[in-house]
Amino acid sequence: MPSGTSQCEDGSAGCPQDLEVQPEKGQLEKGASGDKERVWISPDTPSRCTWQLGRPMADSPHYHTVPTKSPKILPDILRKIGNTPMVRINRISKNAGLKCELLAKCEFFNAGGSVKDRISLRMIEDAERAGTLKPGDTIIEPTSGNTGIGLALAAAVKGYRCIIVMPEKMSMEKVDVLRALGAEIVRTPTNARFDSPESHVGVAWRLKNEIPNSHILDQYRNASNPLAHYDDTAEEILQQCDGKVDMLVASAGTGGTITGIARKLKEKCPGCKIIGVDPEGSILAEPEELNQTEQTAYEVEGIGYDFIPTVLDRAVVDRWFKSNDDDSFAFARMLISQEGLLCGGSSGSAMAVAVKAAQELKEGQRCVVILPDSVRNYMSKFLSDKWMLQKGFMKEELSVKRPWWWHLRVQELSLSAPLTVLPTVTCEHTIAILREKGFDQAPVVNESGAILGMVTLGNMLSSLLAGKVRPSDEVCKVLYKQFKPIHLTDTLGMLSHILEMDHFALVVHEQIQSRDQAWSGVVGGPTDRNNGVSSKQLMVFGVVTAIDLLNFVAAREQTRK
């Protein structure tokens, strides 16, 4: 892939895999303790790539690979990365009324179960080739999980220490696989901005600065990311389709997959239309109007970001579509039940968009969809009916016999006014309050009453014992944002589903609030004054536990006798 050589700050030439590059000016921040500098490189730095359509390969400064056939006996499992199958989609295509041929590139057949195996191996081998990564070194990577699994897999085979930093949102299946591969795992708050020191990116850079001979391969900036798809994935697609591809549909996370494949297809199939998929709540799509939504969170993992990664070349995408959780999980389940493809949620995102975008294609034309990962990582999520019901993605079957209380509303419970805590209260004081009142958890709210998160006695005590916080630290440092909200109008059946998985649920109601009265999204941050613009805020009504539900049912049972 023709690309300009990026210049490091010390003047040496190299690509992002030259990992000892110094942060650019403006990227040093004072720490909370005073003059301590925060050393990091932002994952959205401007790209220096000079790839242009039509520019000869000889101009490329990069090392390029050529797809090879696998031997009958593989020397190690890393040779099982790549050469994934192309499968015709039959029933979904027919039901959608498509005239064109719909094909799926099944990336979950890679050794580690996802498309990210390709870039993980490529980043490591390019760093080894450059002499940056040496035996005994440590690999650190901020990731949503799949890149981490790919890196941990390669590190296990090659003998590197591997530390993976990922948000709390990501599934426990990913955590379990990473641990089994020998990786060390650090979890970070899901809602932390990418440029926050508490984000998965920020924590990874802090670890890199503390651990000798450690490297962040940096999938967000590393040219090896799109190169893996330019050299291999795209060539496989062209070979499997005999050079005939009329449309490609791919979701975007770091953007390396869609960038690398699109650049090669634009060179070899000039008429091929590239369709990008970006979830609602992410900002990767263009034009910018597509990203305007009140939604900031989504359940689908591995795609979408709140920044534009360096490796994403949006110029090669002809059109963007926004995906949503409902369609994504519905189509992921359809791919499993109707096509037998055991894929993950982001595969559903891509397929949901593909059946819309491919409506414009005619008979004899061909649409290829990238299915990024497998269902293995989501057994407790969208594959679970309970999880789908709890999240509101499925409706209860009315024909199923339920207890007498199942369809009663949450408002039937006699909930007392909740104990709430301000984010500036210390951990020590909060623990004392919870113990005095006999509570295990409490909502943390700002001065106007909007919910910032939850704090639990167990989480605070474990954080104190692990040395992550001090007793004098503000409680906002141990904030838990993965709470399950429920409304007064929701059923006790829905509450029951939540309490099967969690110790408590937060009963909330929405309130329209002027922004000059509310704090910003940063926990413990200053007042966000924005010309009185109004927005919806979640306000706490009460906290309900399994004991509350059992007491209600038991009391009503007595009166029913």
Curated annotation (Swiss-Prot):
The lineage of its organism: Eukaryota, Metazoa, Chordata, Craniata, Vertebrata. This is Cystathionine beta-synthase. The modification Phosphoserine is found at S42, S196. Its cofactor is pyridoxal 5'-phosphate. Residues 414-474 form the CBS domain. Allosterically activated by S-adenosyl-methionine/AdoMet. Activated by S-adenosylhomocysteine/AdoHcy. Binds non-covalently to a heme group that may control the redox sensitivity of the enzyme. The keyword Disulfide bond does not apply. It comes from Rattus norvegicus (Rat). NCBIfam families: cysta_beta.
